[in-house]
């Protein structure tokens, strides 16, 4: 069950801190280098801690804070006071363009089903203003797609597109359950699908 798996994952991640993030990033980058990978896209937490390790490694990377918003979409939302959005702003001010552009900061959401349109639109506006890219997990499982279709009558890609999500350069991780129409639309917007083979293997996709 996707919801239960996500809840268990969030409980584990809630115990993390920047020290844990740095250790995990160091191991992850070492594994990348082992296979000759020198450029990464990272969508997770603690972007500043990740940027520190990336800077030391000499690798190139696009880093995004995996933002989420579970509260009622009717509740007030203010980009200028939201904790995650302000963490993003700080990371952009500190790290975006570091070392002649070797490190770039993107905006990001975890996924369609862990956020809502107020966050999407605020991040898209900020990304457009600052010339940033966008990252997200998209259509990783059929359960995710079916859930969105049941709620809205649209696929996750279609729903996000209604809110002009793909009008900024977008990197979508997963993409294993896109429809033909989704693929055509993402191609139209020149979105990039990022391959995540280990994640897909763990999920049985």
Question: Which positions does each model-derived feature cover?
Answer:
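Short beta->alpha connector loops
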Residues: 40-47, 113-114, 175-179, 199-201
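Active-site-adjacent C-terminal substructures of enzyme catalytic domains
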Residues: 165-205
